[in-house]
């Protein structure tokens, strides 16, 4: 391998391992094992959670409607429900997500 190719490879690796490596994740689509790796790096030891399945969320929304909780506008948990229903795959694989959006999926220590 030519010396300049070797140098280019080393520089590319250093750029990925540098202090802005977390920001590199936020500027690309994260799918499959790349998404899982990004979550492990973002959440650290606290780990990350898997949102409830869609049926559980729909049941919760029906219960809220029956109790009249939707009449007063969005409830405090509305954003959380929207995030869970939308899902991390939609946020980070189909679209580009930020570091802060990844942190929303971390367990609270």
Swiss-Prot record:
Propeptide residue intervals: 56-84
Keyword Methyltransferase: no
GO molecular function: hormone activity; identical protein binding; insulin receptor binding; insulin-like growth factor receptor binding; protease binding
Gene3D superfamilies (alphabetical): Insulin-like
Cited Pfam families: Insulin
GO CC annotation: extracellular space
Signal peptide coordinates: 1-24
UniProt keyword annotations, A-Z: Carbohydrate metabolism, Cleavage on pair of basic residues, Disulfide bond, Glucose metabolism, Hormone, Secreted, Signal
Domain of life: Eukaryota
Disulphide bridges: 31-93, 43-106, 92-97
InterPro entries from the UniProt entry: Insulin, Insulin-like, Insulin-like_sf, Insulin_CS, Insulin_family
Location(s), subcellular: Secreted
Any one Gene Ontology BP term: G protein-coupled receptor signaling pathway
Entries under PROSITE patterns matching the protein: INSULIN
Function recorded in the entry: Insulin decreases blood glucose concentration. It increases cell permeability to monosaccharides, amino acids and fatty acids. It accelerates glycolysis, the pentose phosphate cycle, and glycogen synthesis in liver.
Family: Belongs to the insulin family.
Quaternary assembly: Heterodimer of a B chain and an A chain linked by two disulfide bonds.
Name of the protein this chain belongs to: Insulin
Species name: Octodon degus
């Amino acid at each position: 391998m030519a010396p300049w190719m070797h140098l280019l490879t080393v520089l590319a690796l250093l750029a990925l391992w540098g202090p802005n490596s977390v920001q590199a994740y936020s500027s690309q689509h994260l799918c499959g094992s790349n998404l899982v790796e990004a979550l492990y790096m973002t959440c650290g030891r606290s780990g990350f959670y898997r949102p409830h399945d869609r049926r559980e969320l729909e049941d919760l929304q029906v219960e809220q409607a029956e109790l009249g909780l939707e009449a007063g506008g969005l409830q405090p948990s509305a954003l959380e429900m929207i995030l869970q229903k939308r899902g991390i795959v939609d946020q980070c694989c189909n679209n580009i997500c930020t570091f802060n959006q990844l942190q929303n999926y971390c367990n609270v220590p």
